[in-house]
Amino acid sequence: MPSIDVDEADILILSDGLKQVNELTREITGSLSKITSTTSKSSKLFAPIIETNTRLNVLKRNIESSFDSVSSIKDLASDASKYEIILEQEITQVGLRKFIKTLHKVDDIMDDLREKSKSTADFRGIVTHLEELTMIGEKNLQIYFANKLNQIQPFDPQVYMNKKQNFPYYYDEDLNDIAAILDYFGDTEQNPVTEIFMKQQGQLVLNSLAFLEPFTKQITSESNVPYQRGSSGFNSYTEAFITFVSGVSVLIDDVFVKLPDRRPAVFCKIVAPILHNYTKILRYNIDLVKDDINNYGLFSFELSENINRVHQLFKGKPLQNNEQLLECEAELKSISESLFKDLIQYIGQKTASLAQLPTDNGVTEATVDVMSRLRKFSEYKSGCLATIQSMTRESWLPNESKNVWTISMTPKNAQQLLSCFFSDAIDYLTISLERKAQKILNPNLEPEVGAPHKRIPQMQRIGFFVLTNITLIEQIVQRSEINTVLEDIGAARLVKLNARYVNYFASDWRDLASNLLDQVFVDSSGKISSKDKDQVKEKFRKFNEGFEQLVSNYKTCRITDPAMKKLLKQEIFALVAPMYERFHNRYKDSFKNPRKHIKYTPNELMNILNSLGR
């Protein structure tokens, strides 16, 4: 047996072991490949299962969340269903308070749902439905609101003013309903019911005033006819306007009880168009006055009175300084101020047109005309006062000497100034009549008016003529508003004026009596000299002749006014009787045959003088 090398044998054994290891490695590698392949296939199979399982878990959580949401709004949904039934009914059936309360509760439900932002996304349909339900409910509320307001429809204000009745107004229950609805919608700029309120009230007033507007388009029914106080339709329009605006103000206070800050804006929105229309009609009437100032001039005072009333209406309220109204007021003031001077100028022109004195030295047509105008002037006292307060006396006084006026003081206030104007007008009328009488009776002499102490030819006749006209003036003053305008200071001026022309009338009687004032000296024995006796005889003769002539002249005067007749008799008696009695008693025993020179005893003279007053 051949020998085997040990090293070779080790190599053979090692090689054989390596072969076995390689074979085993190949088998392991093959097994691992199979495992890897199987693992890959398993992974692909389990991925969808895991994904599905994940989705199922998410869905489970969503379902659980939904169940939680449904559970949380179960009660809200139940309440909403009940409220929906209420809101679908008529407000008159449900009752306004319950209807509004239900709307508030629905709004609360929506607030709760909106707070649950995640849940709301799943129940958007419920929220949308509730929003639509609220919109319908609020729309019905607006309709109900409008129907409440429309219970008062446009009406003719004149019907109520003629009957002295209040304009229609809402009952307390209706006011409470209107206020409740306004309060529900709250204080917002786009508040729909506030808009409804403002529009409805504005149209109600404008459409009601439209009944009166046609009567504001003319001042008198016929052209070229003087305006009669109170006859213009604009007065009724103003009265209704003031009543309506006052009513709107009261209504706003009544229904905006819980929204006081909204009142001024609401008032302006309603009243501004109404005031605009008023000023437009006012402007139209001012233009009518300007077109015929002679007939319609005094109407400007009435328009001013109306404006003053409107100013009082808006005092302390919005719109109190309305520009259009202030412009109309300024223009009217200018027109009214011109009337004062125009009347004074008219007096001068009217008296200057006299061609001759009345045959009975009586009342002239000029006096009647002027006093008629002055009487009408006095009917607008408040308008005159408003105008004259910014004027001065010099603005109407004509160019006359200061001594012709019965007063020289400067008035301190509007009332005194107005009294002064009327007295100045009466003064100017009388001195103008006197001036014209002097020109007619003494054409060759320059007139000197208002000067009772100067000797003017035919002074008694002039005095009687003016006094006759003053008598009519006094009668008109007493029977008209002139009396209240004049007040005490004006009445005193009229007395002074009357006294001036009584002095005119009594001037010849005064001269007659003054003739008895000449000094004749009697000696201590009571005798007078022959020369002085002749003077006394002459004085008695002149007195007798003058007295008879003056009595005759007096009787030719047709004095029909008892007061004037009494006044003149008293004046003459006071001038003549005491002086004659003193002279008579002093010299009655100076003659052997007194009756030859002394025609009247004091008693006989007094009887004649007293007869003048009968």
From Swiss-Prot:
Places the protein is found: Bud; Bud neck
GO BP terms, alphabetized: exocyst assembly; exocyst localization; exocytosis; Golgi to plasma membrane transport; protein transport; Rho protein signal transduction
Pfam families the UniProt entry points to: Exo70_C (PF03081), Exo70_N (PF20669)
InterPro entries: Cullin_repeat-like_dom_sf, Exo70, Exo70_C
Keyword set, alphabetical order: Exocytosis, Protein transport, Transport
One term of GO molecular function: phosphatidylinositol-4,5-bisphosphate binding
PANTHER family: EXOCYST COMPLEX COMPONENT 7 (PTHR12542:SF41), EXOCYST COMPLEX PROTEIN EXO70 (PTHR12542)
Family the UniProt entry places it in: Belongs to the EXO70 family.
Protein name stated in the entry: Exocyst complex protein EXO70
Name of the gene encoding the protein in the UniProt record: EXO70
